[in-house]
Design a protein with these regions (language model features):
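Transmembrane helix-bundle signature of multi-pass membrane transporters/permeases
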Residues: 11-14, 18, 22, 40-41, ...
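Membrane-embedded helical hairpins/re-entrant loop segments and their flanking transmembrane helices
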Residues: 2-32, 200-271
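Membrane helical hairpin/interfacial module
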Residues: 4, 8-13, 22-81
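Membrane-embedded alpha-helical modules
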Residues: 52-171, 276-305
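Short, non-helical or kinked segments that cap or interrupt transmembrane helices
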Residues: 7-11, 30-44, 84-93, 146-152, ...
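Helix-loop-helix hairpins and the membrane-proximal interhelical loops
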Residues: 1-13, 116-118, 147-232
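Generic transmembrane alpha-helix signature in multi-pass membrane proteins
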Residues: 1-3, 46-54, 80, 104-111, ...
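Alpha-helical membrane-embedding segments
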Residues: 42-49, 71-76, 101-102, 121-128, ...
Length: 305
């Protein structure tokens, strides 16, 4: 994808993440848990999404995302019949396995991104290493709120270094409009049964991740056990909003574990506070310049994070 398309998709992703978070906070019918959960574009689907888009095109990927989201959302509506099959230890194991499965993707990004002309160059290794070191130092030595932002700190350090090394190009900013609404159906959905089944399988993993995050949030930040209704509603939001995400050319959304840790450490579980962050994401998504700047982040920086 060229930078202009990537910028549009990033804008759409920010808007969808904000909408998903608001739905999770303030439910629509049975969709949404009414818990302080932040939603964002899921890393769980990354490897599969790259494979499907590379083999069949973005249209096939988006078609699978839409159908898979409807399947997960429907499962959430009937969660009381199957939720006990996923005890906390299973959910925790799945979340851990997701992290390990992303290691090859991170390694490729660290070196500059698979297929990049400068893949494995010294510049990429230096930027990636400095970014990683900044993340680790912040995680080890920082305290409280700053420690929870270790990934953001590393990203900023790596981005500034890449800027001074001449690895960032802002030339595309000049032709952008000031405000642009999210673009519906940037890719025409196509439906491939193999791709759909593969994506549905990963949606089940994503549902387990959401259940784990919901349980962890209730136990650590709210000091109580989660209700079956809450976990099912969280999965509904995960699935149905992911289908909407597909309509805007984005991959599925899911709950973000980082917010669970932040809520546990800070004690901030006020839904209005989380909603303000969601609204900021939506506002950021309608300004093309923000989306474009995010596309300029070098792959090595992302890999280091």
């Amino acid at each position: 994808l060229d930078s202009s398309v990537s910028a549009v998709l990033i804008q759409n992703c920010m808007v969808i993440a904000g909408i998903g978070t608001l739905v999770q906070l303030y439910p629509v019918w049975r969709i949404g848990s009414r818990l302080p959960i932040v939603m964002g574009i899921s890393f769980t689907f990354l490897s599969l999404a790259i494979a499907i888009a590379g083999a069949h095109g973005m249209g096939t990927l988006i078609g699978a995302v839409i159908i898979g989201g409807l399947v997960e959302g429907t499962l959430g509506l009937f969660a009381k019949y199957w939720i006990k099959l996923i005890p906390p230890v299973v959910a925790a194991t799945v979340v851990t396995a997701i992290g390990f499965s992303l290691l090859p993707v991170g390694a490729n990004s660290f070196a500059g991104g698979q297929g990049a002309a400068d893949f494995g160059s010294m510049n990429n290794w230096v930027v990636g290493s400095v970014t990683l070191l900044a993340c680790l130092l912040c995680q080890i030595f920082a305290k409280g709120f700053l420690r929870s932002l270790s990934v953001l700190v590393g990203l900023l350090v790596g981005y500034i270094l890449a800027l001074f090394m001449g690895m960032i190009d802002f030339s595309g900013l000049s032709g952008l409009s000031i405000v642009a609404l999210p673009k519906l159906l940037p890719f025409t959905p196509e439906f491939n049964i193999g791709a759909i089944l593969s994506v549905v399988a990963v949606y089940l993993v994503s549902a387990t991740e959401t259940i784990g995050d919901t349980s962890a949030l209730c136990n650590s930040a709210l000091k109580r056990d989660p209700k079956t209704k809450e976990m099912g509603a969280a999965v509904c939001c995960d699935g149905f909003v992911s289908s909407v995400s597909g309509l805007f050319g984005c991959t599925p959304i899911t709950s973000f574990s980082q917010n669970v840790g932040l809520a546990a450490m800070s004690g901030v579980v006020n839904r209005f506070t989380i909603a303000m962050g969601a609204i900021i994401m939506i506002i950021g998504g309608i300004f093309p310049a923000i989306g474009y700047v995010l596309t300029t982040i070098p792959q090595a920086v992302l890999g280091g994070c």
